[in-house]
Swiss-Prot record:
Lineage: Eukaryota, Metazoa, Chordata, Craniata, Vertebrata
Signal peptide segment: 1-20
Keyword RNA-binding set for record: no
Family: Belongs to the LHFP family.
Gene responsible for this protein: Lhfpl1
Name by which UniProt lists this protein: LHFPL tetraspan subfamily member 1 protein
PANTHER family: LHFPL TETRASPAN SUBFAMILY MEMBER 1 PROTEIN, LIPOMA HMGIC FUSION PARTNER-LIKE PROTEIN
Amino acid sequence: MRNSLTMVGTFWAFLSLVTAVASSTSYFLPYWLFGSQLGKPVSFSTFRRCNYPVRGDGHNLIMVEECGRYASFTAIPSLAWQMCTVVTGAGCALLLLVALAAVLGCCMEELISRMMGRCMGAAQFVGGLLISAGCALYPLGWNSPEVMQTCGNVSNQFQLGTCRLGWAYYCAGGGAAAAMLICTWLSCFAGRNPKPVMLVENIMRNTNSYALELDHCLKP
């Protein structure tokens, strides 16, 4: 089955899918930051959290051991994490869109030309840059009261305190770096250059199709 990608392009499509899935999965999983509170493990992402304290009987704090997202966007602990949520989400969406188009290029002929591949590579660079910006913004929220309670009350911006970064944070950053550096470069060689004969055939086919449709419309 012919497709619109070269051998390098096929590898580019596969790597694009891997990086997009890795970054997007890491974005949704609440394993960016690990700490503890009231003797229970606690983990965060930008907009989700696992295990949180609530007031029990007698107004004592007890830990609810479950994962969930914050009730609203404004409930996210800090402005930096709110910005991180938006920026990283936009980057993941862009990488997923390019990955989907790249995979379709493996199955459809004449979908991705050499120029189109380079444009998609530029989009991947922007997507990776957005995710990288989100990862850079994330430490700015470590001084929020909610995070400080989890990190021994000694955390601050770019200071973890007793907490540690989780694997999802590294996975998101790694996926962004791969998209920016490797996928962007491979995209320059992904699409096939259309052959002149093929271009003429396509033009003639489209012209004949339009002529038939016009003739059909003009008939009484």
